[in-house]
Each structure stands twice: as C-alpha cells, then as structure tokens.
Amino acid sequence: MWWTSGSIRNNPRAVNPFLQIHMKIFCLSLLLLLFPACVAPWTKAVDTAMRDEMKQQELVGLAVGVIKNGRVEYLKGYGWADREKQTPVTRQTMFRWASISKSLTGVTAMQLWERDRLDLSRNVRDYVPEFPEHNATIRIRHLLSHQGGIVHYTNGPVIATPREYPHAHPFENVIWSLNDFKASPLVNAPGEKYSYTTRGFILLSAAVERAGRQKFAHQVRDRIAKPLGMTTLQPDYQWKRIPNRAVGYRKRDGKVVVSTDTDVSWKLGGGGFISNIDDLAKFAEGLLNDKLVKPTTRAKMWTQQKTNDDQLTGYGLGFSFKQYEKGELSSWKAGRTAVVLVGHSGAQEKTRTYMILWPAKKMAVVVMTNSQHANINKLTGRLLSIVWPPEPSR
C-alpha cells in the first residue's frame, strides 16, 4: 500500500499521514470548543437588544447584519417569516428592500457614468424621449438627487396614461412603467429644491436601461449582484414564486395582522427589489470596499448635493446623507468628532428596511423586517449604539 512505502519506513523524520489527519481533527475540535469564548461581547448585546425591540414594537420578523472593518461580522434572523405557519426568520428569508432599491439604481447609473455611457448633465429626454418635455430640462443629476420635480405619491396629481398592453405583467418593461405618471405635472422646477420621489427613480432606471443597452434588472444582476455574490437579489414580482419570501404584517386597530400583497413591479428602480439579509450585507460591504465603483466615483456619489441656490439637500446621488457634528450623536457614541453617515431606508407594504454606512470606519449596519409598523429608526439607532466603535482616549 502507498502509505507503507519506503519513504516513511526509512525516514525517521517522516510523519505518518494518519497521524497528520488525527492532529488536524484534534486541532479543529479544540478550535470549535474555544470558539464561543472568542465571540465578540457586542454580539450578545446585539442579540439581547434586538429581542427586546421585537417585544416592545410587536415585530413579527427581523433580520440584522453588522459590517465592521469592511467585513461582515454578524448576521442573524429573529421571529417569524410566516407567523401563521410558524416559519422562522433565517438568513435565507427574503425581505423587500423598498427604497433601498434606489441605491441600486444610483450605483448602476454611476457605473455607466464611469464608462462615459451616461452623462449626468444631459437631459433625461436624450435617453428617454418617451418622457414629455414639460417645458423643463430634467438632468440625470437631478433625478439622482431627488431634484427633478417628478411627482411622488401625495405631493401632486398623478396622471396615468391609459393604454393596452400585450403582456399580463407589462411593468417588467421600465419604459412602460413611465405611463403610470409621465403625464403628471412637475411639482417644482428641476434643481429648485429637494423633493423625494420614487417615480423620479423609475424615470432614472429607464435612462439607465437605454444608456446601458440592457434591461435595467439585468444590469443590476450583472454589475452588482454577480460581482458581489448576491445570489438572492431579484425583482419582487408578485406573480413569480420566490422561495423563502416573508409574509408581511401591519397593525390594525391595535392588532398585528397580515399585510396586503401589492405589485411593486412598476417601481423596480425606486422600490422593487427583494433579497435575504446576507445579500443586503454584501451590498453594504461591497460599497465600503469599492467593489462596485472607483473610490473617486464613490466620493462623488456620497457627496451631499445642492439646489440651484446652493442649499444642501441631505442627499447624494442615490444615497441619503447625514453629517453629525461634534457631540451631536451622543446617544450613538459619536463623541468628540464629526461623523458622516450615508445609506438609505425603505418603507412600503410588508417591510421596513435600513442600511447605514460609516465610510470612514468601513462600518455598516443593515436591518430588514416584515413588520411595516416597525419604528426602524429607533431599532437601527439602538443597534448602532451597541456596535459603534469606542472613542479613542484623549
């Protein structure tokens, strides 16, 4: 037999392969026994806090993730993905992203900008001539920063353009999605002010589709999901069976009841994607480590934009933006230095989500819940207060 060859019999220094295997097994077993003692103490605090928030807020299901030093360090699910069937939330549970989808649209737009395929200063009609002129020049930059004057939900009349479609689910086509609102009057002149709008990002996704010469959803798949290994990120098409999709819940008359399923296909670029917690964490980690755009592009994307009269908007290009001055974030342990955070939140039927990144520290937290009555700011703030790095001594 090969393991009794002369190389072992005649060499006293040779190590028997069986002994090597047993030594490896012993070392691995020892490592597994010691592992619980090596778990960072903050993870237990996170677990306790999240369970407490679930109880206080009567949340049904929750998943959270923590990225520290540019690495995913914590991922966990809590509660029920389907309360009625007693299906627990796991890392495989699928939650709607809601408006965090806007950051996907922002990244795909900036990737095209890097390739000179999308000009941020160009009129959106240069890419999407189907959109009416409205006696205004709406630039790509305006759409990326919520300054295009496109109607949102309740801040102006939404005028649909009726038409017959050859398909049962026409809004898989982002150009056709424009028929939901393209006849609506602008709510303000482009660049005049910041006015948050999901429909503005639908128009932006149409420009991305035209500039990239590929379906918008496929650009997200090929240039974001695949490079980051996000295996579950996809459009949340209600007519498709998506394994592990969470049931949504809301409060009605003080009771937590099942939410209504709604079609979000028409607003894919503004709030139509779904994934598990692992993939949202991978997106945050990829952003922090410049895996999707160049560092200079990321800096541009995460620079707070201004209106025509130089008023700061609190929003970058596809990402919300907040600067906390010295001592302002005492409850989150910001301490003595200013802190700049970027990210996005999401709110719609069946979900509340949040992704907050601290670029200077390569740190992020991600939160997803199927309870649309959740106070996501409170929950995320509590999570941040635990994982926030200690302030250096004077």
Model-predicted segments: where are they?
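Active-site-proximal loop and beta-strand segments within enzyme catalytic domains
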Residues: 80-198, 212-214, 240, 247-257, ...
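Short, mixed-charge aromatic SLiMs
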Residues: 129-137, 224-234, 305-312
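Catalytic loop of the DD-peptidase/beta-lactamase superfamily, centered on the K-T-G motif
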Residues: 38-76, 155, 209-214, 218-222, ...
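N-terminal leader/targeting segments and the immediately adjacent pre-domain N-terminus
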Residues: 10, 16-89, 95, 111-119, ...
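Short, surface-exposed recognition loops and adjoining beta-strand edges that mediate ligand/DNA contacts
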Residues: 234-243
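Tryptophan (W) side chains
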Residues: 2-3
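Alpha-helical scaffold elements that line and support the substrate/ligand-binding pocket
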Residues: 64-66, 70-71, 96-119, 123, ...
